[in-house]
């Protein structure tokens, strides 16, 4: 076959990061975008990534850092609620995990983004779009109207002079 049809398709795997269905030293490149922070044991993932990468392989990943959603955490506390935001890992801790897993001289960086919203409803809808709640010990049942209203009021109190609510996102690379 000629043209694009002659290209091999990439191997895609859907699996637990910590138990990849791949042979040791079988990958030239591992790419993970904004997913690592969902795994409860990122140190285990780093060991697994080191196992499947070839000696000269490249690991590229991004994950949310600990300053992500700081304003939302503060609003939860102000509303008298227990925050249901993941405890994101610091970039230095990721670097340490990489060294412990056998990676040589990892290069880490981070970037802080500031997203603004016109309303607390818009902000909360965006946060919900990031996925579910992985906390095993979270409160059973739904958040009541009064508690949800208190959270929205606490977010609305954070509005800047332009009437917008900020939400910080720290991306670790």
Residue ranges and their predicted role:
Residues 13, 58, 78-79:
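Conserved catalytic core of the tyrosine transesterase superfamily
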Residues 28-43, 63:
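A short SAM/SAH-binding and catalytic strip from SAM-dependent methyltransferases
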């Amino acid at each position: 076959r000629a043209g694009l049809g002659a290209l091999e398709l990439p191997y895609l795997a859907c699996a637990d990061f910590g138990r990849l269905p791949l042979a040791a030293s079988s990958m030239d490149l591992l790419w993970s975008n904004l997913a690592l922070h969902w795994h409860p044991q990122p140190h285990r993932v780093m060991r697994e990534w080191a196992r499947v990468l070839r000696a000269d392989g490249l690991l590229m990943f991004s994950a949310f850092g600990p300053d992500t959603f700081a304003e939302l955490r503060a609003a939860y506390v102000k509303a008298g609620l227990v925050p249901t935001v993941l405890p994101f890992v610091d970039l230095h801790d990721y670097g340490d995990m990489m060294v412990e897993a056998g990676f040589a001289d990892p290069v880490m960086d981070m970037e802080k983004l500031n997203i603004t919203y016109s309303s607390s409803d818009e902000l909360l809808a965006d946060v919900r779009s990031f996925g579910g709640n992985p906390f095993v010990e979270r409160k059973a049942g739904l958040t009541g109207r009064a508690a949800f209203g208190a959270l929205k009021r606490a977010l609305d109190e954070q509005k800047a002079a332009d009437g917008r609510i900020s939400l910080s996102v720290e991306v670790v690379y």
